[in-house]
């Protein structure tokens, strides 16, 4: 039985306290049946690789995949998107042009772009180097979880790179604002 809570938290219970083999520990032992009384976080990967959210934003990426997977010609607001993703990289293109890349792979939720701002929530197994396409040769202020991490300038091709500290099961909200 899965009970959904805010964000991606869930409470898990199993009939007769039979814990699935997928929940074994590193040493191969099953955890205590008490696990059904604790809250655990579910990976927020995007199983369909890319989707449009109810609020009109894009979500994409699946960092849990061992093999490269992609979706091409995904239509969103009149543009065609292509996503390539797996544990080592996640890359998004719009109409054949670069938009987002992370190394290693990540899951991105609520990706939105306006004239002056890019916002998204990102999750991954470990810290990631993220590159986004912005306006050429402009200055931006970067925020992670509402905290300013400094000003950055895009290069002549409009790319801005930042490092984000990630831990599986926890999203980091990124906001990039043109100065």
How should these model regions be labeled?
Residues 19, 23-33, 67-96, 100-102, ...:
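C-terminal beta-strand-rich structural cap/linker in extracellular carbohydrate-active enzymes
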Residues 141-143:
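Beta-strand signatures of extracellular beta-sandwich domains
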Residues 104-108, 147:
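Small-residue (G/S/T/A) turn/hinge positions that recur once per unit in extracellular repeat modules
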Residues 39, 135-137, 153-159:
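A short, sequence-level motif marking secondary-structure junctions
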Residues 1-86:
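Catalytic domains of carbohydrate-active enzymes that cleave complex glycans
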Residues 146-152:
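Surface-exposed loop/edge segments in extracytoplasmic proteins
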Residues 121-138:
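Surface-exposed beta-strand/loop patches in extracellular or lumenal glycoproteins
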Residues 5-6, 110-117, 154-158:
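Short, ordered beta-strand-loop transition motifs
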């Amino acid at each position: 039985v899965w009970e959904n809570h805010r964000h991606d938290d869930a409470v898990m219970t199993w009939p007769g306290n039979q814990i699935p083999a997928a929940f074994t520990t590193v040493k191969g032992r099953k955890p205590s049946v008490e696990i059904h009384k604790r809250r655990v976080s579910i990976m927020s990967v995007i199983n369909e690789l890319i989707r449009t959210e109810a609020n009109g934003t894009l979500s994409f990426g699946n960092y849990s995949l061992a093999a490269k997977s992609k979706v091409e010609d995904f239509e969103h607001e009149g543009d065609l998107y292509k996503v390539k993703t797996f544990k080592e990289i996640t890359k998004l293109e719009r109409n054949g042009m670069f938009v987002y890349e992370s190394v290693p792979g990540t899951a991105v939720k609520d990706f939105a772009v306006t004239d002056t701002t890019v916002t998204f929530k990102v999750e991954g197994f470990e810290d990631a180097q993220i590159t986004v396409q912005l306006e050429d040769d402009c200055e931006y202020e970067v925020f992670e979880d509402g905290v300013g991490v400094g000003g950055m300038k895009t290069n002549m091709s409009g790319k801005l790179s930042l490092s984000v500290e990630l831990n599986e099961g926890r999203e980091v909200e990124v906001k990039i604002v043109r100065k």
